[in-house]
Amino acid sequence: MLPSTNDKQLIEVEEGTKIIKGSNVIITTLDKVVNWGRSNSLWPLTFGLACCAIEMMAAGASHLDLDRFGILFRASPRQADVIIIAGTVTYKMAPIVKRVYDQMPEPKYVIAMGSCACTGGIFNTYSTVQGADQFLPVDVYVPGCPPRPEALMYGVLKLKEKIMREEGRWGRLK
């Protein structure tokens, strides 16, 4: 049985979250609880297309260990909620990347890692897509050629912050 709030004092610990003094009861919105769960259990799909993939693998290695942030790399798009586009995307590869993205369940997020994935990099040619945002809705850009593993970790932390600010995104958007 919950203690009545008449004899207990509500203490606001952050905006929209209160605790009942003297108990283990937290009062908050459903958005905050769902976003907390999502942001602390990201499952990225690694889609390495060039040299940035080496740095992405280094970010998952023991030195930085993204697992401590609840990030578990997945090999199947049906199990992932984040896709990390790491490297140069050609026009021939773009439909395949889009198909893999479409196979991911909602809500899904995109991280563009490296100068090539962000802007096309040094390859301003007829065969290179000038940024992953030309065919996917990119949420976080991680610049660099190639970016350090710490930069990818910073990008993932920025994505976690973005997820915590979402409202009402619980399932498939219509």
Curated annotation (Swiss-Prot):
Under which main EC class is this enzyme filed?
Answer: translocase
Superkingdom of the source species: Bacteria
Q: How does the UniProt record describe the way this protein sits in the membrane?
A: Peripheral membrane protein
Please list the coiled coil stretches: none
Q: Which reaction does it catalyse?
A: a quinone + NADH + 5 H(+)(in) = a quinol + NAD(+) + 4 H(+)(out)
List of residues binding [4Fe-4S] cluster:
C51, C52, C116, C145
Picking any one GO biological process from the record gives: electron transport coupled proton transport
Q: How does it assemble?
A: NDH-1 is composed of 14 different subunits. Subunits NuoB, C, D, E, F, and G constitute the peripheral sector of the complex.
Q: What is the designated name of this protein?
A: NADH-quinone oxidoreductase subunit B 2
